[in-house]
Amino acid sequence: FADMISYKFTGPKRNSIIVFEEPIENKVLYTKRAMGLPGETVKIQDGILYINGEATNFRQYSNLGIGDNEWRIPKKGDKLEIIPAGNYNKAHSYTAIDIEKIQKELKYNSASVYEFMPNLKFVVNGEETGLILDFIHDKDVVAKLMVGETVEVTLDDDYYLALGDNTDNSFDSRYWGFVKGSRIRGRAIVRFWPLNRIGLVK
């Protein structure tokens, strides 16, 4: 079960378990912990999550999908640039582009964003950061990126770093990027699975 009311008035607090629509298929509900909040910097090094440069003691995380990079979590009003880098495959400019086919592929495999658009960079207020995959649902944005154009937008919402308790192998923000605030449906309050952990969420 989830409390669907709390976050209508205030954003999630750190370490709270949130229920949200992931940004790829745009319909699957996940439950993860909100570990990074809008405007903060996050980094995972030697299994430790750093927030604004300070080590946390919540739990150990692998840095798969992040590497040694420090990410700035976007917040409402930030300027986002999505930039196809220098070795972009210009062959796309001379062929018909099936945007719907590309969107479908990206929905099922977010990593393929780099197959279609090599070295795609996400830059917030001049700082390179992690994936922001909401754009794959906008045909106009995808079309511009496919011909090597930089897309610039002003973000209309806050974003969060969502991490799973299965810290070495969780399908979370380390793989599909930040979670937009409007995707969050509520706060998880009861756990039904696995069976040996049924009860109130803490």
Give, region by region, the residue ranges found by the protein language model:
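Soluble "head" domains of membrane/secretory-pathway proteins
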Residues: 1-202
